[in-house]
C-alpha cells in the first residue's frame, strides 16, 4: 500500500510524541500507517481537560483503533498531549462495565449485598421505588444528584431540567464545584457575567505571561507549547510562575516565585499598591469603566456551623460589599508594602518588584492564567477578584494579548456545568434559582406551571456529603465523576453517608471506580464517541461530535439514562395539586412527556440524521433528541450575550466561540470592534453589570483554615500529574500511561526527608487530623517542594489522598481547598 508523505509525517508525529515521553504506541501510529485506507475518520474534541483540543478519531469494525491531533483544529493545530494520543485505549479497559449491577442478598436488594448483574428494568424498578418513597416521605429535598463537567451539554441540560423542573429539587451540583466554582463567583462579582473575555489567540500576541497556581506544562500542555513557542521566539517576552512549590512550568520561567501557602492574596494587593504608587493606573479606562467596592471580611471557612472557626467568624458566608472612593482604596492597598509582603510570603523583594513591573508597564501586554491554585482556596473568589483588579487598574483587558484568563480543568466545565446551569444555585445563561424573574423565564420556556422550580438554593457538593451523613439526603445519583476518591475528607463526611442504610446511592460510570464500588447500584455508561456529544472549552468554544461506535454490552449514555428514567414518574407523583391546577392538561403525563417529548424538543425528525449515522438515543425515541435539547437550551442565551450558533453549524466547524452573532464568533468580549454587544463609541462595556462598569474589590489577606503546628508540621498540597487525569479512572487503564507513572508518591524536600530519616523510595505514612495514607517518598523529579510542604497527586485509588484533606471551602463559592491542610510523616 502506498503512503502519502503527509500521512507518513502524521504517523511519525504520533510516534515521536509518545517516544518523547518514553512510551510505545501500539495500535495508534501503526494503525494510521498500516490500516489507513480501512479506517473511517471523524472529528471530536478530546475527552480530557478543558483546553478543548481537536482530534481525529479512527474507527474500524466498531472500535476506535486510532487517534491523532486534528491539523484543522485551531486550539491544538494537530498536536496532542500524551493523554490525547492514547484516547482510544481509555474505552477498552479489561474491567469495563457492560450491565447494571445491584447489591443483592437472597434475590433482592440489600445494602450489604454483593454486586449482582440485573437488567435495566430491574435497576430502574429499584431506583423508582427509592425515589418515590423519599419524595413522598420527605419531599424533593431528600433526593439529589452529583454531576459533572464531563457531561455533554445536553446531558447536563437534561439532568438540570429533570431535577429542577421535574423533581422540583435544586439538590443537583457538578464536580466542577470542586474546581471552577470560585472562578464563576469571581467573574459574576466583578463583571456580572461568567467566563473569560479573551481567547487562546492572546498567546501569540502577549508580551508577558503570569501563572498563578497553574502548572500549565503538565495540566494544559498544548497551551503551554504555544506559550513556550512565543517565549522562545522573542527574547522580550517574559514568563512569571507563582506556586507554593516548584514544578515543570518553572523551567521556562524568567521569574519563578515560590510563596507561603495562602499568601498569594498579599502579593496581589502588593501589586495593586505598586501600580498606584508608580502612577501606572490607566486613568481614562479606570474613570470610564470601573467602580470600587469594599468587601465583607472574616467570612469563615465553609465548615459546619458548629465548627469553632465558623463560630468565631464575624461575617460567615457574607458576600456583602459597599462603595468606596479611590483614595480609600489607595489607603487600603498601601498597607501591602514591599517589606511586609516579602516578610509574609517568603518571596525575595526583587522578585516581587519584577512581577509588579510586568503589570505596571503600560507597553507590556500581560495575560494572567490560573487554575486550581487560585480556585481551590478558602479565599478563591477573592483571589479571582484581586487578579481582575490588576487588569482593571491598568486597562489590560479585553484586547488582543492581554487579560485575565481562568483555565478550566474539565472538557465541559464551562459548556455544561457553568453555561447550562447544573450548579445547585444556577439556571441556564447565568440565571439563578433565587431570582423570581429568572425562574419565570425558565418555567415559561419549558411550559411548566409557575412556581415549579424551587426558589431555595440546593445542596452544593460538600453540603450533599454532610446531608447524606445526617440522613437528610436519602437518594443520591452520581454521574460521570468519581467523587468518593476526588472529594475531600472521605472518612469523616462522605463514606459514612454513602454506606448509611437509610440512603440509596446510584453511580453511573464505565468502570468500577472507588465511587462505583461504594454505591448500591452501578449503571454502565457509554463513553466519549460511543454517543453524540458537545463540550464547551475554556475559551468559550462549543464543539460537537457524532456518535462513531456503539457502547459495549448494555452500557448506555447518561442522556439515555436520564430521559428513560423520567418515564417512570407521572406529574401527580412529583408535583403538588396547586401546580397541576394551573395546567390540568399535564395531569397523567410522565416527566418524559412534559420535559423531553415536548413539541419544542421533538420537532426535529430522524431524517436530519444521515442514513448510516449512529445515534442510539434518537433512533430509539424517534426524533433527533440532541438537536431538540440543544436548540431549546440555546434560546436562553441568544440576545443576552451568550449567543450560541444554530445546531448544524457546529457539526460543520471546529467549534465556535460565543457569543456567535450573525454567524460570527467573538474572540474578545466587552470591547468595541470585537464584541457585537459593545456599540460604536462605547470603547468598553461590561454589560453584565447594569451600569456597564466592572468592579474592583478591596479584599484583605486572611489565613488558611488549617496550618502546620508542632504535631502536624507540614503543609500538604494535592493535585495532578501529566500522565493521569483526575482520579485515573480512565488513564490508569491505559497500560502505557500507567507504566509511566504507576503509583502516587509524596514529593518532599530532601532536607525534610533527611530530618525524618526518610530516603527516596521509602514507604511512609502520611497522617492528618482526619485520616492517613501509605505512600512512597520522592525527593527528586518534576515537583520540588520547599521545606515545610509536601505534594501528592490524587490519581491513585490505592492511596486515597483525600482521606487527609479538610472539607473547608470558600464560603462564597463553596469550592473546596485541596491545596492547604496540615500533615505529618512517619517511616513505615
Swiss-Prot record:
SUPFAM superfamilies: ADC-like (SSF50692), Formate dehydrogenase/DMSO reductase, domains 1-3 (SSF53706). GO terms for biological process: cellular respiration; Mo-molybdopterin cofactor biosynthetic process; nitrate assimilation. It comes from the Bacteria. Pfam families: Molybdop_Fe4S4, Molybdopterin, Molydop_binding. Substrate binds at residue 794. Catalytic subunit of the periplasmic nitrate reductase complex NapAB. Receives electrons from NapB and catalyzes the reduction of nitrate to nitrite. This is Periplasmic nitrate reductase. It comes from Salmonella arizonae (strain ATCC BAA-731 / CDC346-86 / RSK2980).
